[in-house]
């Protein structure tokens, strides 16, 4: 069973609470629709894998300001006692629709929708965006690494290089979601039910008088183990594994050797040759050391006999694309569409649905439509929560998300599965109804800005 650290309602930005008090003072309690989406793909990404929904659902179900939170807010001197008394009773009572975790999404497509009284939806913005953004970035990187490995196991080794303990656990989770075999991080494994993997450190070998003695001690305690062979000299370390095999005879059950430095191309081939000559064809080769999807792809293209990969730094920080232009924006309030016309940041108004078309099992195009439209394709967004409680049949599970993610990757056009930039842009159309509503709101905005002109149009409501 998952065991997670609780994050309280105070994980929010100050302006969320100041806006909440202003809404409260103005008696604004209408239903708002907020959507999370990103505007453009970062370099080196042809899609984004949506993730983080499970943590969002858990947070929303437990949302409340406790006494310590309220005491702190009172001490800021910006909030009235009456408002804080009211805030103490606030819970998330809204609905959530989302693309299930593991879904592949593209620019301007909502990953998550929150439909709730505006104060509730505003107060949860920081946490919701934090989790969807972080975990989607990490899952997208992991999906590329897993794809590069071509079915060989990939293991998350990155906890010590992650940006904090929470991020380390999220890396383990999203990597597994995206297809990794498991993690070395025990806390994450316990929290999320992820398989664990581990070898040994160079320090263990160094602590013994000889490398052979270290290998023998470890193999005696953990017979079906993996031995790290590059502490002093990689090929000499391989010879010591062979020596150990001769000494133990039928009791030798070492499953793999790990290469963690040097020219992995040359060393993996030499290691395989020595092991095979010694009759140890069953001993696999596991590689680590600064790997990412491009290095893994290059090693396999060179026919390196590597059977699995441990990936750390590049996985946990997604160094080539560590952030998304992801936003949490109001698209409707009190039954009316909302938008903004800032340069380069126009928002499509209204609650939306994404319709995805397939041909012969391959995604061939999406259409962004209004919620309730009936357009060709399968709708991506499904109900996750209603009235503040999760819908069990749609509640995200990690194993379910992992299976779904694999299906999503398998259905991508070949151009999007490629690690290289093929120049192919996945088509995302916008329905006529959304385009028409955006034009209507723009017309109304122009009329408001120039009241003496001859422009006529309905005046858009302002939030």
UniProtKB/Swiss-Prot annotation:
Entry GO terms, CC: cytosol; plasma membrane
Maturation and modification: Transiently phosphorylated on a His residue during the reaction cycle. Phosphorylation strongly increases the affinity for substrates and increases the rate of nicotinate D-ribonucleotide production. Dephosphorylation regenerates the low-affinity form of the enzyme, leading to product release.
List of residues that carry Phosphohistidine: 202
Pathway field: Cofactor biosynthesis; NAD(+) biosynthesis; nicotinate D-ribonucleotide from nicotinate: step 1/1
Gene disruption: observed consequences: Double mutants lacking both pncB1 and pncB2 show an absence of incorporation of nicotinamide.
Induction per the UniProt record: A member of the dormancy regulon. Induced in response to reduced oxygen tension (hypoxia), low levels of nitric oxide (NO) and carbon monoxide (CO). It is hoped that this regulon will give insight into the latent, or dormant phase of infection.
MF annotations from Gene Ontology: nicotinamide phosphoribosyltransferase activity; nicotinate phosphoribosyltransferase activity
InterPro entries attached to this UniProt entry: Aldolase_TIM (IPR013785), N/Namide_PRibTrfase (IPR041525), NAPRTase_N (IPR040727), Nic_PRibTrfase-Fam (IPR007229), Nic_PRibTrfase_pncB (IPR006405), Nicotinate_pribotase-like_C (IPR036068)
Catalyzed reaction equations: nicotinate + 5-phospho-alpha-D-ribose 1-diphosphate + ATP + H2O = nicotinate beta-D-ribonucleotide + ADP + phosphate + diphosphate
Keyword line: Ligase, Phosphoprotein, Pyridine nucleotide biosynthesis, Transferase
E.C. number: 6.3.4.21
Function according to Swiss-Prot or TrEMBL: Involved in the Preiss-Handler pathway, which is a recycling route that permits the salvage of free nicotinamide (NM) and nicotinic acid (Na) involved in the NAD biosynthesis. Catalyzes the synthesis of beta-nicotinate D-ribonucleotide from nicotinate and 5-phospho-D-ribose 1-phosphate at the expense of ATP. It is not able to use nicotinamide. PncB2 appears to be responsible for the increased salvage synthesis of NAD during infection of host tissues.
Record-given protein name: Nicotinate phosphoribosyltransferase pncB2
